[in-house]
């Protein structure tokens, strides 16, 4: 609650509680008075309520905005509040008093705030007055009551101000100043003089603050510092002009006091001065001595003329010291004596009321003014100002006397003159459909007062404000004061639009309390205006009322909302801003008794009535048929009371002596002419008049107040004779009879005993009858409706309860949450059914249900007392309880015991089968048992389970430790553990695992013992399987390490054998390589070959069902555990392999016989036709493209000798599947295999292969031991030795010559040159002769890696010594054993790989023999470019020997083993062939070579790779074949042609035919080469700058990317591979476009730039001996070929 300030008003406003708010539905909203009647019991407790219509109910605003003009009222806010107005009236009286005393009131300022003189006066008066407060020294307490802090001298200051300002006024009010005015005696005078001398009051003008109060109250208050402070402070000057809003007058500050004084007549100090004064003439007076007239009216003396004051009102004279209180000095203004002052102050004041504004507004102009005022006052937009802030500010302003805020309010504007805000059917204009709906609505305020149920509908006169709505246009702070409606009727207010309207209401029961509080707090106002609250001009702070116990409620009415006030409910409020509202009164039937009470109240207050209440009642009774039944009943009651009261009054008047009476129709007399002169009540039934004044009349309540004439002279005027009143009453009773009958029936039915109760149907009929006849909704009506509603509700609940009882199973299964009745509720429900005012059919069934519940309770108690819970019995009780559909307290307990019983059943069932008693099951049982309610049986079972679980877990953990132990436990220990755990009645997985591990260990040990005790060793697969099975067994197996070591040794042997035999990334397994081939004749990739092999196998199976698969030797080896069977299978596969190879060779050799259809024949692994260079496999005799297979590697191919082509033995990848290790290596593997106690399929296959190889070796040695072959081998050896020696000697001479040239350039060494030459030569010769068996070192840069050689040819270069030593036939067959020269300048083409060096020796020997010289010499010829003649073979063998050797060679090549005998046989067979015989094909296609003699760098990468591959083949095979290359290049435009060396004569004949055409074509080619030589030179220079040339390596047969210049090998046969700065290139201009190092071909940089270079190959083609050839160019003729190249051409 807010605190109350010193003046009695709240310091800070606290909003009261909110009133109820109702939101009717559309159905409820259709009948407004019925809805208000239903909410009246709740809403009348707060006096006011708010109704929110449905959202869609929005009536249009029907006022004419443009023509709506009104004049508002002016409201000064601080004059509205009662207590503030009392203070202002007090200050007016005080200011008027001092003005009449010739002084201006100055209100002091104490502690920086204006002193509240009214509060000071009241507080001092409450403490006994000035004298007592001063005597008892209570001024400090007075200051505390005023809110001042003690201890600052405030008490003395307040005393001074009170004594100077209020004390004279107090004396005046008490009448002391008038005492003795007519008693002039000397004693009084002396007393007064003494008092003056003792008091001597000196006013302090510095402290004073003037407040100029004009004759009319202006409510302006000036502070003490106005005169000086305002002038100094500019802000205060502004505040004088601008207030808070357009109508604010400003602060309570007046203009500056005028300093001019009013000229006054002073009393002179001597008589002579007195005659000089100008006196006012009086009419009717004599001219006498004026000095005699001036005597003091108090003391009667005329002395002390300077102290005599002349009154400006009556001209009486008074000494200043004779006045009470005495004046210290002569006043400056007009002065009046106490007598005149009393006369002036006692004049009656005008009644307070609102003034009308001068300006007339439209809605727009008023809205603009209102919005501007609010926005300026709060300094923010109007819509942003909170309602709470406006509310607090309003109550602060109305309680402030310092701030004078003026607002305007357009109130009480009659809608009859200005139009209603609701649509109204007046016939002036056609209405829209939506407007017509609202025009007929009962909530339309034009219709509500005249509704059928409304009492005001029976008043014909349009009462403005009651039947005719009033309009209200408000602005911020405009307010309506505390009031109640006329005749205490209802009121309803609708806010059409705008900002909210704040309401405060007090309920009717507190109306008199509010009036008493206001009289108590503002008695001065009620003394002059007893009916002040009916004038709507007084407001009081709700907090003050609440402080005094008056209940106050509030609400904010927003646009579109109704506010209803109830009879005699005081209400007030204010507007938050600009808005438009409409209000009207209405009266319902329940108002009639209240209206009668209001008229009696008005009679006591002598207040005028708006209409005659008696006339209204009798008017309704006169036409009872048109009355509503409820209204008729209420009228009947009121009419009965009025009849009785009227009969009593008339009888009392007759008894007083009135004898005359006369009937008069009072309704025809105007209301103001039939008012009682005593109480002002409008008379209708009767009145009393007198002949002395016929216009004057009184009611029968005041018969004596009419006049003093005797009663016999007075006349009783009446409207109805007394005998007519019962007939009127009877008519109303007949109308209300049906209602009375209904009331009696309802009352009897509702109060009937149990045995005589009506049925529910009868009560429904009564209720429907009341609703149809529209009986009033009184207590009986509501009681009947509530009874029917209660009975229906009970019937529904009973029906639901009984239906759920029947459907308990379905409802329990649904799982939905339902609220059941408790037993207490069921009992209460049965009691409620019994106490119903009617009977329903389900009562007996509900009673039976209660009996079942009680029976269930007894049986449940017995079941819960059992020692061991019985699940079946408990389940039956639970089903019974669930079927009752009642919340039974025993049911949860029964469910708990059922869970316990089921858990015990589950435990017993589980323990009965130990196999089901797992750890998880026990844990789950324990966990589920822990959640059960405590029970001794459950606890016992839990203890047993826990013990069993603990023991089981202990054994499980022990078994787990044994299973995971490292090292493993022995079998004996584990058996003991298993035996001990047998007695535990539980399922133990770890113990079972341990038991299974023991069983597996026994089985595994038995298998191992069986294998070890067998006749044969076990296969590796068996041991691996045993090892894999025994390793995870968690038992210590004594035999397992032995088995694992055997497996590891066998695997190591197999891996070693695989590294020995298998190539890198080989697609064959070791067993396939060691076994005879089954895929002979199958070509393609790995997948295709395997598929074809399977097809062959299927075909073989169809031919011979008993024949095993060719490719499944390994399966045979694995299946054949007997050694003899393994050997038999191997022999069978061996024979099939040889037969298949014979067939394949025959088929491949047959391809050469179909030259005419050679384009249709498929070759190579790609199975395409012949093209490009092609190689022939020496084993399968098929031809292979050089781009499809890897070329055979030769250690001498870097230097490129022309006669090496015969030495190359080519085996295709299909025939040569492995590395083919030497037999010595295989023998070491077999020795290791014999040490293994394990059988391997690979080992047995290796044994078979070794036996096969040794068998073949024996056959080969036997064949080579014949005389014919022995002599052939000897001959080859001699030729090879001689060739090697000659080559070494020539190279040594070259080295010596180079050293001598270097020494010749040094003068110091010239004397030693002869000896140096001789010693060097001797050292070389001796080294050649003394070291015939040393092996040279191979240059790592210029030879292929050993790994590549091993992959390609099946033996290691490092195994050369072993090869030589192992040969028992010819120890000196290999040329690389003869000359131990380590210089890199030695011609390295002589030190070739063992497979081919013998072939080189054979060729050299044959050539030297043909020349008849001891040193190898070239065949004499005219030019180096002239080809030699064809030479015969070196050796010639008999056909039988040759066939035998060829058969051995084929079988030896099938072996995947390197044997020396294969090399011997190969050399012999090669020596039997002519040296010029070709073993390759060269297929020419169209004109791709002849028409493009110069190949540019612009070719794509694929063309470059193809060219590099071609150059590789040419270097390997071509230099010795230059004579035949031209024969192969046959120009056939659209057809490939295959040239075979089978028939040399055919080739020569064809060559002769083509020479003429070829000559012309070559001429054209030479011209094209000369034209493009410059372009080649530019390209060469660019390549030199980049140091990277597109010159392929001769060894890069796979077509890899080009190497850098430093590592590239040129096209020369003896490339020296120069390094870094010596790498300079030159390109052949003869047509082959090959690149050569300048160092390798002896060309300087100047020669390469200025002249053409033609390589040896091109020079051979263009030699002078060739027919039709031009002589070589001068550069070639004068150029000396290097010695190496000349040797190569020999």
Curated annotation (Swiss-Prot):
Q: Which UniProt keywords apply?
A: Activator, Biological rhythms, Chromatin regulator, Developmental protein, Dioxygenase, Iron, Isopeptide bond, Metal-binding, Nucleus, Oxidoreductase, Phosphoprotein, Repeat, Transcription, Transcription regulation, Ubl conjugation, Zinc, Zinc-finger
Instruction: Briefly explain the null phenotype.
Output: Knockout mice are born at expected Mendelian rate, and their survival does not appear to be compromised. They appear grossly normal. Knockout animals exhibit behavioral abnormalities when held upside down by the tail. They have reduced peak frequency of emitted ultrasonic vocalizations (USVs) and a severe reduction in the number of USVs compared with control littermates. They also display severe disabilities in both learning and memory. Mice exhibit a severe reduction in dendritic complexity of cortical neurons.
All copies of domain JmjN, residue ranges: 19-60
- Per the UniProt record, which EC number(s) apply here? 1.14.11.67
> Which residues form the C5HC2 zinc fingers?
676-728
Q: State the organism of origin.
A: Mus musculus (Mouse)
Cofactor entry: Fe(2+)
Q: Which Gene3D superfamilies did the record assign?
A: ARID DNA-binding domain (1.10.150.60), Cupin (2.60.120.650), Zinc/RING finger domain, C3HC4 (zinc finger) (3.30.40.10)
Q: What protein am I looking at?
A: Lysine-specific demethylase 5A
